[in-house]
């Protein structure tokens, strides 16, 4: 049977030591917060208060240091290497910036990743990267990122980069933002809310419908933050590709239940995260 590859996405992994912690609990993907200084430089991997219930909100690294740690965790042959860790979502906290700084934020983000993660294109980290932007008005971050990799001589690295708008906007509005940014693929669509609150699955179902339609723009759908078995089952039943969680072991347990084992498998490096799964 053709099983849907699933991404178990460790939520709020902002200290380097947490990479091991979350992957060892079953995550094959992590989400990391990125905060910016007033000049649109990515500064810290930091969430801050408030954050998910039951989590410390204050763990952080300098962004460049985190990237170096992440590179080690995703470079075959390194002592810290995890073959299982194949996708990283950067939750870009651009709310602190003016709309007209989005391009610069993308440019500076690209330079940081190029140097500290991709090692200037020389045997850098291998994980796929999703740039997750909270505000549709900040679509020029994508343009800045793409144009910088090109001008720095590494346009091929965009093959490893995907996109997400995380503001729970209407799906049509998200599609329009991608048109403006010139994005025609590599689209993950998030939907969700902090684990302190409940949220239904109606928009997730809209996103799945777009993904599975012949003219949709979405390749993968993920739901956050899912900490309970019942919610995990509901999300999987709705057909998501990824579940973001504070407890990767909980999601792993559910995926091991016979009903889900028949339909899903844990995604590996050979699963292209930009390809829509066809049953």
From Swiss-Prot:
Q: Which GO terms label this protein's molecular function in UniProt? A: lyase activity; metal ion binding; phosphoric diester hydrolase activity; toxin activity
Q: What keywords are assigned to this protein?
A: Cytolysis, Dermonecrotic toxin, Disulfide bond, Glycoprotein, Hemolysis, Lipid degradation, Lipid metabolism, Lyase, Magnesium, Metal-binding, Secreted, Toxin
Q: Which CDD domains match?
A: GDPD_like_SMaseD_PLD
Enzyme class, UniProt record, top EC level: lyase
**SS bond list:** 51-57, 53-196
What activates or inhibits this protein? Answer: Inhibited with low affinity by edelfosine.
Q: Where is the active site?
A: 11, 47 (nucleophile)
Give the matching Pfam families.
GDPD_2
Tell me where it resides. Answer: Secreted
Reaction(s) catalyzed by this protein?
an N-(acyl)-sphingosylphosphocholine = an N-(acyl)-sphingosyl-1,3-cyclic phosphate + choline; an N-(acyl)-sphingosylphosphoethanolamine = an N-(acyl)-sphingosyl-1,3-cyclic phosphate + ethanolamine; a 1-acyl-sn-glycero-3-phosphocholine = a 1-acyl-sn-glycero-2,3-cyclic phosphate + choline; a 1-acyl-sn-glycero-3-phosphoethanolamine = a 1-acyl-sn-glycero-2,3-cyclic phosphate + ethanolamine
Amino acids binding Mg(2+): 31, 33, 91
Superkingdom of this protein's organism? Eukaryota
Annotated TM spans: none
Q: What is its main location?
A: secreted
Q: What is its EC number?
A: 4.6.1.-
What note does UniProt attach to the cofactor annotation? Binds 1 Mg(2+) ion per subunit.
Report if keyword Mitochondrion is assigned.
no
Tissues expressing the protein: Expressed by the venom gland.
The Gene Ontology biological process terms listed for this entry are: killing of cells of another organism; lipid catabolic process
Family membership noted in the UniProt record: Belongs to the arthropod phospholipase D family. Class II subfamily.
Role, per record: Dermonecrotic toxins cleave the phosphodiester linkage between the phosphate and headgroup of certain phospholipids (sphingolipid and lysolipid substrates), forming an alcohol (often choline) and a cyclic phosphate. This toxin acts on sphingomyelin (SM). It also acts on a broad range of lysophospholipids, like lysophosphatidylinositol (LPI), lysophosphatidylglycerol (LPG), lysophosphatidylethanolamine (LPE), lysobisphosphatidic acid (LBPA), lysophosphatidylserine (LPS) and lysophosphatidylcholines (LPC) of varying chain lengths. The substrate preference is LPI > LPG > LPS > LPC >> LPE, LBPA.
Protein name from the UniProt record: Dermonecrotic toxin LrSicTox-alphaIA1i
Q: Which organism is it from?
A: Loxosceles reclusa
């Amino acid at each position: 049977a053709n099983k849907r590859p699933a991404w178990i996405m460790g939520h709020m992994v902002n200290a380097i030591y947490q990479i091991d912690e979350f992957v060892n609990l079953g995550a094959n993907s992590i989400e990391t917060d990125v905060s910016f200084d007033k000049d649109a430089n990515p500064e810290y991997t930091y969430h801050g208060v408030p954050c998910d219930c039951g989590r410390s909100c204050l763990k952080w690294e300098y962004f460049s240091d985190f990237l170096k740690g992440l590179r080690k965790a995703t470079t075959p042959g390194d002592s810290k290497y995890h073959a299982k860790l194949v996708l990283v979502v950067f939750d870009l906290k651009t709310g602190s910036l003016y709309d007209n700084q989005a391009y610069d934020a993308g440019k500076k983000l690209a330079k940081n990743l190029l140097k500290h993660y991709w090692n200037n294109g020389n045997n850098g980290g291998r994980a796929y990267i999703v740039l997750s932007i909270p505000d549709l008005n900040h679509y020029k971050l994508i343009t800045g990122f793409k144009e910088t990799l090109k001008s720095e001589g590494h346009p091929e690295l965009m093959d490893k980069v995907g996109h997400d708008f995380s503001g729970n906007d209407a799906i049509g509005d998200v599609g329009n933002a991608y048109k403006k940014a010139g994005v025609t693929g590599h689209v993950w669509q998030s939907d969700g809310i902090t684990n302190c609150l409940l949220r239904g699955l109606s928009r997730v179902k809209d996103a799945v419908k777009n993904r599975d339609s012949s003219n949709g723009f979405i390749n993968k759908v993920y739901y956050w933050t899912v900490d309970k078995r019942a919610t995990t089952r509901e999300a999987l039943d709705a057909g998501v590709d990824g579940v973001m969680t504070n407890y990767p072991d909980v999601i792993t347990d559910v995926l091991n239940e016979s009903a889900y084992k028949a339909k899903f498998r844990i995604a590996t490096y050979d699963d292209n995260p930009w390809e829509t799964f066809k049953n």
